[in-house]
Amino acid sequence: AWGESSSDDVTLEPGLWVLDNYGTKLVALIYNGSCFEWDSSIANPTGTRATLISGAPTSSRHMLVSPTDRHLIFFGTETTIGDTTTQDDMFIRFSDQESLNDYTPTSTNTAGTQRLAQGSRIIGAIRGRDTIYIWTDSAIFIMRFVGQPFTFSFEHVGTNCGLIGKNACMEVDGTAFWMSENGFFQYTGHLQSMPCLVEDHVFDGLNSTPRDLINCGLNNLFGEVNWFYCSSGSNVVDRVVTYNYLESVMLKKPIWYTGTLARTAWADSSIFEKPHGCYYTTSDNSSYDVVGNTDGITIYYEQETGTDQVDAGGTVTAITANVLSGDFD
């Protein structure tokens, strides 16, 4: 009845952000929400707040910028822009080329829409070498820029291979890797199920409820693709399964590792010489003043070195260094 409490569990989708670059602008989408832009080229950019992108959809599951043609693409978005009640989990909308604000298809622009047919919702999408990979909960599609009059082509290339969580995928040197609800897959121009001797260990011990917390990270120093996930009984990431694609090629057999390395976010070595990652711990409180934050902290690591990027002098901060971790096996 109204006004009475309920003891039933409620599962909410996490408030994940999607970030991408559009020239000097950062575009940022809150999961199932609106999209913002922040311009780094203006005077005093760090003193300027991000603003909503005018004319853009106001409720979307995912977004990215196409790699060569500069269209802003929204996935699982509104069929009528500005009306959140029209959000369709299988609907795709893309802007006019070189525009963040024009989404109305006309005979003189390249804006457009597409609805995918296989699956019940789009889970995630990533840029590849020459394509965009799109996963639903049951299939994979390839999206390619083809120019006028269609702008993009959409090809259904796999079934019964959906993505388990929106960040559980990546591409390495033209090969897409991802974790599904029923195993691991790769796409190299054709779909392949990946033989995995530790598959039972992973999926029998997986908490699939917080599936959007699963994240995939590349460690190119060792030729490893890592999936960080929540084990049974845990609501935070506390396990990892790793596929070593370099050793698998050299030894001509699939090489997998498992472990308890917990990373809630991951960035491979590029700007920095080593990979960087974060993990969440409930055993500590934040050392900075955040009202109401008594449930734990997120700790930031530079893998392999133990360097505190905030204060190399060693003053205690909310960002803690790690010990030398060695190989990720």
Region annotations inferred by a language model:
Residues 36-46, 80-100, 146-148, 234-249, ...:
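Surface-exposed flexible segments
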Residues 22-49:
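Hydrophobic or amphipathic alpha-helical targeting/insertion segments
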Residues 1, 11, 16-21, 120, ...:
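Beta-sheet repeat architectures centered on beta-propellers
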Residues 2-13, 43-215, 249-258:
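Beta-propeller and closely related beta-pinwheel folds
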Residues 25-27, 71-73, 242:
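Residues within well-ordered beta-strands of beta-sheet-rich folds
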